[in-house]
A protein has these predicted regions:
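Compositionally biased, proline/threonine/alanine/serine-rich low-complexity intrinsically disordered stretches
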Residues: 17-29, 73, 167-177
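Alpha-helix boundary/capping and short turn/kink residues
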Residues: 47-50, 120
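Short solvent-exposed beta->alpha transition segments
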Residues: 29, 35, 51-108
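Positively charged n-region of N-terminal signal peptides that target proteins for export
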Residues: 1-4
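Exposed beta-sheet edge and beta->alpha loop/turn motif
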Residues: 97-177
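Short, low-complexity N-terminal intrinsically disordered segments enriched in polar/charged residues
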Residues: 19-43, 47
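Bacterial N-terminal signal peptides
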Residues: 7-17
Length: 177
């Protein structure tokens, strides 16, 4: 009887599907998919198309913004404001994703990105990253734009409180050319 109960207790976490995330390497397939998705989102942003960004944003940011509709409205308004201010994207490039980090039942990795842009005729280089997040055991990634985290690193922990300790953000910034 005791062995039966012990086996049941050991099997219970598996039945509940509460597998915690483990830090590790990004597979070549995941790396290619991440780069492709980030490139597609950056391309949409450059064209003024916000729908892919809105659809692929991690729920934690939508919640922080006041919900899905509030986030969608803010994203559309931001893209319009940037265009009105004379910001145009010349080119974008998604880099090779780094390792993964545990975040409770999710895993996280950073995807570097570099953009050349023009701000009222002044060329600039933006170096930043996207934070890719997915539930362990799934293939669909959701994203957070890391640009806001460069000036506010605490935002990462606010959005992903279960993220393993000691994770440092990639470097980034703006540079006039």
């Amino acid at each position: 009887m005791h062995r039966y109960l012990l086996a049941l207790l050991l099997a219970l976490p598996m039945a509940m599907d509460v597998t915690p995330a483990l830090a590790g390497e990004v597979s070549p397939e995941d790396s290619a998919a991440l780069r492709k998705e980030v490139q597609a989102m950056m391309g949409g942003f450059a064209r003024g198309d916000t729908e892919l960004i809105i659809a692929r944003t991690h729920p934690s940011l939508k919640q922080l913004a006041g919900g899905d509709e509030a986030y969608a409205r803010a994203t559309r308004d931001t893209v319009k404001a940037l265009r009105k201010a004379g910001v145009t994207i010349i080119s974008d490039e998604a880099g090779v994703p780094g390792r993964t980090y545990a975040a409770g039942d999710e895993e996280v990795c950073f995807v570097p990105r570099q953009s050349l842009l023009r701000v009222r005729e002044a060329p600039m280089r933006s170096t930043s990253f996207m934070v890719a997040v997915r539930r362990v055991g799934t293939t669909q990634w959701r994203y957070l734009d890391g640009a806001a985290m460069l000036d506010n690193p605490a935002l990462l922990r606010q959005l992903l409180p279960a993220l393993e300790p000691g994770v440092t953000l990639p470097r980034g910034g703006m540079e006039a050319l």
